[in-house]
């Protein structure tokens, strides 16, 4: 969809489905930049193996769970550190950094609750990025975003990218929360 509309820098903002890797690697050759998300050792190994087999670089973010509990690694956990190390050491992977989504902000009932999620969202990835950098791992990007949290946040320190999905349209659903 986005590639057909001539978008040239695309992030698949959900952890990669391993069965779709061949299709995704093909698509990556049609745009200027295509970034995948991973949150498991199997995903890192599978993306790395396909990149090697195809002699095609893969741009990959590590998905971080900032409290939503749906996907991503728990920041500062041994598992999270291991995956970041695997990504940074993989020969054919360009480790893009950390990405999170405060999806639980959609369950909030007021601005104060949303603001608390916004703080949690930012601190989860910024703190983890700092810990990785302390270990010598380069973390180029720190990406956050949900429309509700972007509407109330006043501190983006340490963040390099925001992705407030439907912020530009701000539909009735957004206005309701």
Residue locations for each model-derived region?
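Active-site loop/helix belt of alpha/beta enzymes
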Residues: 59, 65-177
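Active-site-proximal beta-alpha core segment in soluble small-molecule metabolic enzymes
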Residues: 1-111
